Amino acid sequence: MLTVDFIDDNAQIDAKHLPEIERLLIFAAEQEGIDEEAEVAVSFVDENEIQAINKAYRNKDAVTDVISFALEEGEDDFEMSDEPRVLGDIIICVKRALEQAEEYGHSFERELGFLSLHGLLHLLGYDHMNESDEARMFGRQDEILNAFGLRRDV
């Protein structure tokens, strides 16, 4: 089962939102066949912090909504151990999530779910660098969100 660790050093988000994000990520991991013990960290940051991370690691000096860092990237075989599989980190800019929820006409909860799931799918190897990969990733996102009950109209 997936364990989700939340990091919110600057009180960016109301804790009432965390249980649903955790349930969604556990549901998504199950949908993706992650049946062993695994961990993911979800951090909530402000615009300055995500811009600094984006610049340092992606060479893009701009605010973004979500960034993920896969700890297993490029590894084909994972050592068998008693330790949980550490998938990586998902970093969400709360202000961008609020803005995008308003822009897209859905709830803040739906946007948080979308961004959390988007980050998790990146950790699991999905990307959107070309048209076919984007269609695959975004289609999978919609399938999982809808199956979980977090549709666009929510």
Curated annotation (Swiss-Prot):
EC number of the protein: 3.1.-.-
GO CC annotation: cytoplasm
GO terms assigned for molecular function: metalloendopeptidase activity; RNA endonuclease activity; zinc ion binding
Broad EC category: hydrolase
Example GO BP: rRNA processing
Coiled-coil segments on the chain, per record: none
Keywords for this protein: Cytoplasm, Endonuclease, Hydrolase, Metal-binding, Nuclease, Ribosome biogenesis, rRNA processing, Zinc
Cofactor(s) recorded in Swiss-Prot or TrEMBL: Zn(2+)
Listed InterPro entries: MetalPrtase_cat_dom_sf_prd, YbeY, YbeY_CS
Pfam families to which the protein is assigned, alphabetical: YbeY
Keyword Hydrolase: yes
Function statement: Single strand-specific metallo-endoribonuclease involved in late-stage 70S ribosome quality control and in maturation of the 3' terminus of the 16S rRNA.
Family: Belongs to the endoribonuclease YbeY family.
Protein's recorded name: Endoribonuclease YbeY
